[in-house]
Regions:
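Long, low-complexity or tandemly repetitive, helically biased scaffold regions used
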Residues: 2-91
Length: 91
């Protein structure tokens, strides 16, 4: 691989690593919000546990859990992409 293409691939790898870092931050924030919502739901008084608000809270938790799962898949795929680029850059 010539110097120019190697430099371009290194720049792309750096961009992917930056995206990976940002994705990790987003993942952490969503997980934290899900935990807060779960704590809220866990502390709803017994007489309100079947209320519309409690049901909506559970729906939100379910959506956030799905989102976390999708982000885990995305993080894994992104890591595999970075590893492949590193392999391409080996001399």
């Amino acid at each position: 691989m010539n110097k120019e293409r190697r430099k371009a691939l290194n720049e792309l790898k750096f961009k992917l690593e930056s995206i990976s870092f940002e994705l990790e931050n987003i993942y952490d924030e969503i997980e934290s919000l899900k935990n807060e919502e779960q704590e809220y739901l866990d502390n709803i008084p017994e007489n309100l546990q079947n209320s519309q608000r409690a049901e909506r809270s559970q729906e939100i938790i379910d959506y956030l859990e799905d989102t976390i799962e999708y982000l885990e898949d995305s993080k894994s795929q992104l890591q595999n992409t970075i590893i492949n680029l590193e392999s391409a850059l080996e001399e």
